[in-house]
From Swiss-Prot:
Gene Ontology molecular function, alphabetical: 4 iron, 4 sulfur cluster binding; 4-hydroxy-3-methylbut-2-enyl diphosphate reductase activity; metal ion binding
Top EC class of this enzyme: oxidoreductase
Protein residues bound to [4Fe-4S] cluster: 12, 103, 198
Keyword Iron assigned: yes
Pathway: Isoprenoid biosynthesis; dimethylallyl diphosphate biosynthesis; dimethylallyl diphosphate from (2E)-4-hydroxy-3-methylbutenyl diphosphate: step 1/1; Isoprenoid biosynthesis; isopentenyl diphosphate biosynthesis via DXP pathway; isopentenyl diphosphate from 1-deoxy-D-xylulose 5-phosphate: step 6/6
General function of this protein: Catalyzes the conversion of 1-hydroxy-2-methyl-2-(E)-butenyl 4-diphosphate (HMBPP) into a mixture of isopentenyl diphosphate (IPP) and dimethylallyl diphosphate (DMAPP). Acts in the terminal step of the DOXP/MEP pathway for isoprenoid precursor biosynthesis.
PANTHER family with a match to the protein in the record: 4-HYDROXY-3-METHYLBUT-2-ENYL DIPHOSPHATE REDUCTASE
Lineage: Bacteria, Bacillati, Bacillota, Bacilli, Bacillales
Protein name as catalogued: 4-hydroxy-3-methylbut-2-enyl diphosphate reductase
Cofactor or coenzyme needed: [4Fe-4S] cluster
Cofactor-binding details, from the entry: Binds 1 [4Fe-4S] cluster per subunit.
Source organism of this protein record: Geobacillus sp. (strain WCH70)
C-alpha cells in the first residue's frame, strides 16, 4: 500500500505561536497563579492534555464570557481563536492578568470588521455556529454583525443598509465561502466582499484537493472539534472525490477503511501535533492487510513530545 503524505499539512504558524506563548506563561514565575486558558488553546485534546501536565488549566464552556465567570484570580490566556471586546473588558474588571494568544490572521479580520463598523457598515460573517472564532468576531457588535453558515441563513437576512460587508471565519472551506459569498452578492448586489481564509488553511485545502485525487481513501488526523480538520475531510470528499475519515490519533483508524486500499492519503489539521500524525503515517506504512500482526493501533507519543520546545526564563 502506498501512503501519500499530503504537503503542506499540520501545524500552522498561528497555532505554534499560541502554544509557545502558553508555554512561556507556564515557565514565567512572575505571573500570578493559577494559569487558565479560556477554552481550548487550539482545538486538539492532546495539546490541552500536554498543557495540563505543565499546570495550565483549560476551562471550556458554552461561551468565553460564561467561562470567565468561573475565574476569580490568576492569569488568563486567550486562545488562538480570538475573543470579543466584552471578554477583554470583563477580564480587566475582575483584575485578571491577561495574555493574548490570538492568531494574527484572526486579529486582522477583527480589525477589518471594526474599521467597517466605524464607517457605518453592517457585517455578514460566514462561520460555524458554536465555534469560538465567530463568537469572538460577532461579539465585536452583535447587533450589526450577522452570522451565517448556510444558504438558508443568507435567505433569512433582512438588512436595510447601503453599506454591507461580507467576510468569514479564517478556517472555513474556501469553496463553501465562495458559494455563500455568491449568494450574498445575489441578494445584496452592493455588498463589499472580503474573503479572509487564512493562507495556511487555503494551502492545506488546495493540497488535499489536488494530492488526494489519486488515493482510495484519505485519513485526516485532527481533533473532532477542529473546524479546519473537518473541512479537510470535506474537501477530500467534495473536491478531490476521495472518501475521507477524520481520526484524533492512530487508535481511531478502522482496518475496514484501509484493508482494500492501494493508496491512502494522509493530511493533518493545523492544530494537530506532528508526532501524532507521524504515528499514523508509520502505522500505515507498515500495514499489511494479510498480516494481522501489523494491525495493532497504539498511541505511544508521550505528552512531553506534543508541545513545541521553548527556553526556560532565567530567574
Amino acid at each position: 500500500m502506498e501512503v501519500i503524505k499530503i504537503t503542506p499539512r499540520g501545524y500552522c504558524y498561528g497555532v505554534v505561536d499560541a502554544m509557545v506563548i502558553a508555554r512561556n506563561v507556564a515557565l514565567d514565575p512572575t505571573l500570578p497563579r493559577p494559569i487558565y486558558i479560556l477554552g481550548m488553546i487550539v482545538h486538539n485534546k492532546h495539546v490541552t492534555d500536554a498543557f495540563a501536565e505543565e499546570g495550565i488549566i483549560t476551562l471550556d464552556g458554552e461561551n468565553r464570557l460564561e467561562i470567565l465567570e468561573k475565574i476569580d484570580k490568576g492569569t488568563v490566556i486567550f486562545t488562538a481563536h480570538g475573543v470579543s471586546p466584552e471578554v477583554k473588558r470583563r477580564a480587566r474588571e475582575k483584575g485578571l492578568v491577561t495574555i493574548d494568544a490570538t492568531c494574527p490572521d484572526v486579529t486582522k479580520t477583527h480589525n477589518l470588521i471594526k474599521e467597517k463598523l466605524a464607517d457605518g457598515y453592517e457585517i455578514i460573517y460566514i462561520g460555524k455556529k458554536g465555534h469560538p472564532e465567530p463568537e469572538g468576531a460577532v461579539g465585536i457588535d452583535p447587533t450589526r454583525i450577522h452570522l451565517v453558515e448556510t444558504m438558508e441563513d443568507v435567505e433569512r437576512l433582512t438588512i436595510e443598509n447601503d453599506r454591507i460587508m461580507v467576510t468569514n471565519q479564517t478556517t472555513m472551506s474556501q469553496w463553501d465561502v465562495a458559494d455563500i459569498m455568491a449568494k450574498v452578492k445575489e441578494k445584496y448586489p452592493h455588498v463589499e466582499m472580503h474573503k479572509e481564509i487564512c493562507m495556511a488553511t487555503q494551502l492545506r485545502q488546495e493540497a488535499v484537493a489536488e494530492q488526494a485525487k489519486d488515493a482510495d481513501v484519505t485519513i485526516v488526523v485532527g481533533d473532532p472539534r477542529s473546524n479546519n480538520s473537518n473541512r479537510l475531510a470535506q474537501v477530500s470528499e467534495e473536491i478531490a472525490g476521495t472518501k475521507a475519515y477524520r481520526v484524533a490519533d492512530v487508535t481511531e483508524i478502522d482496518i475496514n477503511w484501509i484493508k482494500d486500499a492501494k493508496k491512502v492519503a494522509v493530511t493533518a489539521g493545523a492544530s494537530t501535533p506532528t508526532p501524532i500524525t507521524k504515528e499514523v503515517i508509520d502505522f500505515l506504512e507498515q500495514f499489511d492487510p494479510n498480516d494481522p500482526n501489523t494491525w495493532k493501533r497504539e498511541r505511544k507519543v508521550p505528552l512531553q513530545k506534543i508541545l513545541p520546545k521553548v527556553k526556560a526564563k532565567k530567574e
